[in-house]
Amino acid sequence: MNPDFAIVLNFKTTGDFDVDFLVKTARNIGARAVMSSDPAAFKEACEKYTIFLADEQAGLDLASVNVIDTMVNNRKNSEATIINIPVNDGKFDEATQKLLDTINSWMHQFGHAFNEGKPSPLTVSDGFILENRHADYQKYVFLKDIPAKIVVEGLDKEPNRVEWIEHRTELDFAMKDGKLTINLIKPDDVFDWNVLRIQAHRPEDNIIHTEF
């Protein structure tokens, strides 16, 4: 399966259901793949919304209180999280809707880093680091708690910018003896896991802009 598919919704359907609604729900919360025991029913909608239709595998029965922890810990180990989504006569029950809302809220902020992140050789004093598999000049620090500062080791050069992904709030940092010290301030909204971006020098930064 494509490594960019960090979460997969496994729809467990009984009775009638609107497949278009289900696939659109998956897309809207940041999932890039779905599965079902009735794949033929999902084929057209998946093509319509550019969602990958995976072969069905065993999934996890998760709740809003543990879904983000489970997703992040699996991603730390380069694993996708397959989440069982019960659908009864086309509807989600209250617990399932709360689960989906929790995923949506978190993925709305951090889905890009989460889907496209892979393990990084960098180390950090708290949390862990992923790097963008398509643009390795972007590193992502995942933090469960928010200390006053963190220290990142393994960078060759001082980065151009360090920021919370949420609202792109810049953070103060200093590089000395190969150690990047980042001073943290709490973001506007604190999630179960918070993510900051370390932006290194990019290839396009070498382009000289000429005005005519």
List where the protein language model places each region.
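Mature catalytic domains of secreted/periplasmic carbohydrate-active enzymes
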Residues: M1-F212
